[in-house]
Amino acid sequence: MNKIYSRLAFTNIKNNKTLYMPYIISGMVMIAMFYVMMFLNNSRGLSKVPGADALASIMGLGCGTIAVFSYIFLFYTNSFIIKRRKKEVGIYNILGMEKRHIARVLSIETLTVALAAIASGIIAGILFSKLMIMFLYRIINIKAQINFTVSASAVVNTILIFGVLYFLTLIYNLMQVKLANPIELLRGGNVGEKEPKSKWLIAIIGLGCLAGGYYIAITTKNPLQVLSLFFVAVLLVIVGTYLLFISGSIVILKALRKNKKFYYNKKHFAAVSGMIYRMKQNAGGLASICVLSTMVLVVVSTTVSMYVGMEGELKQRYPADISVYSWYKEIPAGLKLDDALKEAEAESDKIIDGSDCDIKESKSYTYFSWTVCREGEEFKPVLNYNNDISMLYFVTRDEIEKMEPGLQGRLKNKIPKLDAGSVAVYGTEKFNNDIINLLSKEFKVAAAEKTAVSQDSYMSSMYSGVYYVVVDSKATLAEIFNLNSSLGEDSVPTMLNNEIDYNLYGSSEDKLAVAKALDKHFEENSVKSDVSGFYVESRDANREQIYVFYGGLFFIGIFLGTMFLMVTVMIIFYKQISEGYDDKARYEIMEKVGMSNDEVKKSITSQVRMVFFLPIILAACHLAAAFPLLRRLLVMCNLTDVKLIVICMCATLLVFVAIYYIVFKITSRAYYRIVGNQI
């Protein structure tokens, strides 16, 4: 008896290979991708690279994302298959098979599919794991010997997670058979449908959600809110997309039908009436295609932008090859800031002169900064970080050009001469008062202009406004700094910084050696000096970590983008099959009411194209609306090249549209095979 059930199960899979082969292949790819991600997450070699913790977090995020989307997608695909097979199951029931016998056949089918997908997926994952780790090493610029290994924990986790998934699909299938009577099963997916109603309220809510998501993406400027509101905007756009496809499309089509002049035209009559039913059946799937397409565009374009602009990001974050910082919590009595800075610079120059590097250029300056909240024309201490916070940089007139190169060239008026009681204020927003109050001491504002600020863009991206308060001398600078210290518990946490920046001639290895020598020297001598602390920052020392982090993001972006694209392709494929079965009957009906074969073909082909290209059009709109928010997120990652971001996004969109069109044309073959001689 068991042999009969097994033979019947294998025959069913073979007879429905058009449905099952894509299901097994997509499951295999999902499983292979999950195994590879688990393998990379557990890799001992990757645990030794600089920035390994960040890379592990990225890989962990990838594992979770693949698992979640695998469950969603494979459940969707399974539900489509079981819906199409209900008639077949109903015939078995009518012919005398009890539901428990049908359940046994379905169990064998599910077990066969699961074993085929899991086994082939793990084998493919193992075979491709070395290739993927080589690709990752190439991206993150790591040179290391790679041995072929198999991760036992990755294999076990993959079997457990996807074994549970296929078991849940079996439970779903058995429930569908158990709860349906034979007549319902025989009707399968051909149950008569009523004309969908115009649900204005749902359509308006959908439009409101979409408008709300767009508004947040376009108008959010507070850096502290960008990340949190990004997810709010994403949620609103997803909800809005589904509601608009489900209800908004019906509302628009019915409004067109009410326009008698438009509707009673042979070009529009069949198309509009057909689209009403077509959108009712396909709205959810089309919304899913739209959301997944948007995910592909956003994930790939942003990670590509970050990876391509990596050197620019590195130079933006670390403008000099080597920077030496020393700071003071309080200025010691009798300390002359100029003397302390010159002494530190002389010591640094001596160490560099004794190395294999030569000084290309250097600069040194003293400054301190305050985190404040601007209320009108006043700057007040930050009480909480929910406010729009700003950064004030205090620096002398003689050293402002060192800290902000090109500032004087950008100003309409040159920085005026200042005295001990006057300052100049330059920032991302203009300061309009003639007097500025700094910790209860008033200063006359000799000049104030709005100008671009590039200093420390990594930090600047976190603030709503960045301002330079330019003073006449270091004596005034020290006076204002000491005013802050005198406030006790009410003081604004800050440090007075001496910074020395070097650009050097020499190899990366030589520059790293200089940075280590400087770090060692100042660590040994910091106890003897009056400084509160110091550190040495090297662009080359941080290059590896930057490459690992952004390279890891690029890798995961391409990986997830590929997965989202595959899911999109499979949904399009199954939608084409669904359209084919539905349109086969539509062709017959439309020909019976007097339409010629050419008219029928033209009408239905235009409907199918409209249905399948609506998602990509709306996805492009989503990407355009998301651009301002994505740009701010990328600025927080030091990518300030807007032109590069636009080029990467446009290139990603063009490539995706081309792939989408090719997929549509290829999957259309399945549609035309089903429709057959009707066309």
Where in the sequence are the language-model features?
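Hydrophobic alpha-helical transmembrane segments of multi-pass inner-membrane transport and secretion
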Residues: 17-45, 53-90, 110-124, 238, ...
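N-terminal Sec/SRP start-transfer signal
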Residues: 1-31, 195-200, 209, 244-293, ...
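Basic-flanked hydrophobic alpha-helices used for secretion and membrane insertion
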Residues: 314-566
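Short cytosolic juxtamembrane segments of multi-pass membrane proteins
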Residues: 3-7, 179-193, 581-582, 672-679
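Short helix-loop junctions at transmembrane helix boundaries
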Residues: 39-53, 122-154, 211-228, 615-678
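Hydrophobic alpha-helical segments
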Residues: 112-256
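Juxtamembrane interface at the cytosolic side of transmembrane helices
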Residues: 76, 84, 176, 222, ...
